[in-house]
């Protein structure tokens, strides 16, 4: 039976809830140059453009139709019922994991629902989109809050905590990730090095160079609940469940 699980989630899990992804063919990068909306330099050049870009995602997330799907709910169930240690690391900046009930959660790329003071680095929960009362309350004069999002060229958040968890886990699961963007792409190597079982859940069939031991190909909303049930039943993931 597993004692220490690390789960990594990427854009694929949120796409099943109706959120557009950054890197798909019809995704947001098609409408903007990356350097204009997702770099510190782009923000320094045109903060209003960057705010509009993230406001469009904020509004989509709060439109009333985007909700956690079965995969989000299954991971929240795993947290509630699993007797061992669990850490869910997400590359997503939405709050669908939180809405599903997950609390043992780390947003390595930041959170769309928060702004950050550029001077103190204190974060603030956003009740409204950027541009509406978006000054900090920690400085005099108040500083303009920037999106609490990790941009290209910036260090992902919580890396020490993530690596500590990977060093000690006996099961690593990646759900809906491309597996091509570092440092997250290297998490499977770390887990394998420390003897963990590694499982990938993805819509696409695995690359022949994949380092994962097991692959589940299909929708996260269908496969993750089955995976969670297997874990909670005290069974080891095997070829009967994975490819």
Swiss-Prot record:
Instruction: Tell me the GO molecular function terms.
Output: histone deacetylase activity, NAD-dependent; NAD+ binding; protein-malonyllysine demalonylase activity; protein-succinyllysine desuccinylase activity; zinc ion binding
Binding annotation for Zn(2+): 117, 136
GO CC, sorted alphabetically, is: cytoplasm
Query: In the UniProt entry, which residues are flagged as the active site?
Result: 109
Q: Which domain of life is it from?
A: Bacteria
* EC number of this enzyme: 2.3.1.286
Residue positions binding substrate: 54, 57
Residue stretches making up the Deacetylase sirtuin-type domain: 1-234
Q: Further remark, if any?
A: This protein might be subject to alternative promoter usage and might also encode a protein with a 7 or 13 residue-longer N-terminus.
Describe the family membership recorded for this protein in Swiss-Prot or TrEMBL. Belongs to the sirtuin family. Class III subfamily.
Q: What is the name of this protein?
A: NAD-dependent protein deacylase
List the source organism: Shewanella oneidensis (strain ATCC 700550 / JCM 31522 / CIP 106686 / LMG 19005 / NCIMB 14063 / MR-1)
């Amino acid at each position: 039976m597993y004692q220490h699980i690390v789960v990594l989630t990427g854009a694929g899990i949120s796409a099943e809830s109706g959120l557009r992804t950054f890197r798909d063919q019809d995704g947001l990068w098609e409408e903007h140059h990356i350097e204009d909306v997702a770099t510190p330099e782009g923000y320094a050049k045109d903060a209003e453009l960057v705010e509009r870009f993230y406001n469009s995602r904020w509004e989509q997330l709060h439109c009333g139709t985007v909700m956690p799907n079965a995969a989000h709910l299954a991971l929240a169930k795993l947290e509630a019922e699993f007797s061992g240690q669990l850490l869910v690391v997400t590359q997503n900046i939405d709050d669908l994991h939180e809405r599903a009930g997950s609390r043992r959660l780390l947003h390595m790329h930041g959170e769309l629902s928060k702004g950050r003071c550029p001077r103190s680095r204190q974060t603030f929960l956003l009740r409204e989109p950027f541009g509406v009362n978006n000054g900090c309350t920690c400085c005099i004069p108040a500083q303009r809050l920037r999106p609490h999002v990790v941009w290209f060229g910036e260090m992902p958040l919580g890396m020490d905590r993530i690596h500590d968890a990977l060093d000690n886990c006996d099961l690593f699961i990646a759900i809906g990730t491309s597996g091509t963007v570092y440092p997250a792409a290297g998490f499977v190597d770390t887990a394998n090095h420390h003897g963990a079982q590694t499982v990938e859940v993805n819509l696409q069939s695995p690359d022949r160079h994949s380092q994962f031991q097991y692959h589940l190909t299909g929708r996260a909303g269908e496969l993750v609940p089955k995976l969670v049930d297997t874990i909670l039943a005290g069974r080891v993931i095997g070829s009967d469940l994975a490819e």
